[in-house]
């Protein structure tokens, strides 16, 4: 896997300090990671804002409880398949993402069968992106 070239588009702001600290730590380790925040609004307006934030060269990957659950190693392999394409992972707000947005993509990702607060989902995703990069590059962070 190439060095990180991912984007996270997330609805809402991170308010918890410990999550902000965790995000800052992983962003230092993933210098190519971009996080874009979209304002909380009605679901159709959020979907509009998410689409407006997307670049034409990005592949949209919504996070959803209906999405595909992968092990960390499987996630790393999946990311490798996308090669140089830039992936834009999307995390919805308290009400999730619109069905139209989720259904317009080729791949949805689930971080857990459980429902997670969107702030925590953001931190978990960033950690898994870092883990995937170290798995692919043979780093010592991931221990099987």
From Swiss-Prot:
Molecular function per GO: rRNA (pseudouridine-N3-)-methyltransferase activity
Sorted UniProt keywords: Cytoplasm, Methyltransferase, rRNA processing, S-adenosyl-L-methionine, Transferase
Domain of life: Bacteria
InterPro entries: Alpha/beta_knot_MTases, RlmH-like, tRNA_m1G_MTases_N
Compartment(s) of residence: Cytoplasm
Record-listed S-adenosyl-L-methionine binding positions: 63, 92, 111-116
Gene Ontology terms: cellular component: cytoplasm
UniProt keyword annotation of Amino-acid biosynthesis present: no
CDD domains, alphabetized: RlmH-like
Quaternary context: Homodimer.
Function per UniProt: Specifically methylates the pseudouridine at position 1915 (m3Psi1915) in 23S rRNA.
HAMAP family tied to this protein: 23SrRNA_methyltr_H
Protein name according to UniProt: Ribosomal RNA large subunit methyltransferase H
Organism from which the protein derives: Prochlorococcus marinus (strain MIT 9313)
Gene field: rlmH
